[in-house]
Amino acid sequence: MNINVADLLNGNYILLLFVVLALGLCLGKLRLGSVQLGNSIGVLVVSLLLGQQHFSINTDALNLGFMLFIFCVGVEAGPNFFSIFFRDGKNYLMLALVMVGSALLIALGLGKLFGWDIGLTAGMLAGSMTSTPVLVGAGDTLRHSGIASTQLSSALDNLSLGYALTYLIGLVSLIVGARYLPKLQHQDLQTSAQQIARERGLDTDANRKVYLPVIRAYRVGPELVAWTDGKNLRELGIYRQTGCYIERIRRNGILANPDGDAVLQMGDEIALVGYPDAHARLDPSFRNGKEVFDRDLLDMRIVTEEIVVKNHNAVGRRLAQLKLTDHGCFLNRVIRSQIEMPIDDNVVLNKGDVLQVSGDARRVKTIADRIGFISIHSQVTDLLAFCAFFIIGLMIGMITFQFSNFSFGIGNAAGLLFAGIMLGFLRANHPTFGYIPQGALNMVKEFGLMVFMAGVGLSAGSGINNGLGAVGGQMLIAGLVVSLVPVVICFLFGAYVLRMNRALLFGAMMGARTCAPAMEIISDTARSNIPALGYAGTYAIANVLLTLAGTLIVIIWPGLG
């Protein structure tokens, strides 16, 4: 039996789509030196090659892909977006505005200089910034711009062409810049990280090991009674001295949870909870020949829970003010926007931050009720909320503004982004509403993006040879300029106007570019995870601004003449 593969693919859009995705994802795993191509560029390259052979898919699939992607971007940004916008993120907001704004202006200028159309210009901006949200925002605005169908088709083809030609340029140039730009300043990143670590009492080890607390039991002997000198537990401050706290006491055969007024007596058996190294540092009066193995005394349920910061008495306060150890709880991690932060007593908590806390189940539940709620470890997505806010986003996108003879619409990209932000924000405030497991959110976002990339590549593939020959050299120059010049401007602004610590500044710059590979290089150079503080500060707001930049470049273009 003979099978004509070309006819088979042309006759089945779904089969063609998944063939493109599978081949593109395989290609995306290839590495050029230390740089991995990545899923987006892999799918785009494969779709462009097949597009040259005149394969195509229904545009409805492309539209659904970008809608899912941009909605999920909003959901991820929602918990932190308003806190960054309105409160303690002024510097991070300004950095993101400078980065995105300067790139937008430079792209507009180069597009006019080289005589490109809006499609090539917007695609070059998206590729140079390695930002799919720019591509999505520009594409959606073009479709709702009301231009003639022939011009629209050409602009959309050039949009994906510009993106494809400059994406790798933008990615590689930023990675190289992240490696060498820190060396051109007077203060190296490691020194900057150590400086802010001393100021804030940070752990600068990027690979800090996290241990769970363990329970050990000891019998109180003469040495320990003498060591306490008649003081009660509150006066002794055992945690401050040892890093362990007394969870239970057995006295005369009776188990009890001690309060601060309890005084240790000869023959008491005490259960101490602490990290392994804290037990190792205990005074010999605790340990020497005194350890006991009492099943009832040691029978405690030590749990590790992820607590989402929500309550007003925790939001805006410093980490040290929570006094977790005074409540018998141990802090393992602080996570913001999926980025692990250094455990810094001076970190100001934002709504939606996640604290990984260990301790007795009862104590962890108490502290969770005080500062927020325990994250739901469920694999069930609230599809009703997902669909409802998706519909709201589409309806917002239909809103059109009329100014004399000029009109423009909000568009699906901005509408869905706003609706996603609202869903993410409400989820951070109401734990039982709109729950979407992070794995499910990542899957939908990635799948939507890959479908969108496959669609734009197949649409643009037929004209790539002509486009490459006409503008290839110009694209190379423009891609480098738009990728690197805003980074330099952002560095100068942050260093000499905002006077930011260099480790935080470089992390914030990579967050404003939403580039995780470059962020890893900055952390390696600093030998610290302190730059993650800056990265998390700009990442959420930059995703939103980049989407708006894609919309703005299309709106502004006709007015430039």
Curated annotation (Swiss-Prot):
Signal peptide: none annotated. GO terms for cellular component: plasma membrane. InterPro entries: AAE_transporter, RCK_C, RCK_C_sf, Transp_YbjL_put, YidE_YbjL. GO terms for molecular function: monoatomic cation transmembrane transporter activity. The keyword Transit peptide does not apply. Its main location: membrane. The chain crosses the membrane at residues 8-28, 32-52, 66-86, 94-114, 158-178, 383-403, 406-426, 447-467, 475-495, 540-560. The keyword Transport applies. Residues 200-288, 292-373 form the RCK C-terminal domain. It is a multi-pass membrane protein. Disulfide bonds: none annotated. Keywords: Cell membrane, Membrane, Repeat, Transmembrane, Transmembrane helix, Transport. It is found in: Cell membrane. GO terms for biological process: potassium ion transport. HAMAP family: YbjL. Belongs to the AAE transporter (TC 2.A.81) family. YbjL subfamily. This is Putative transport protein YbjL. It comes from Salmonella paratyphi C (strain RKS4594).
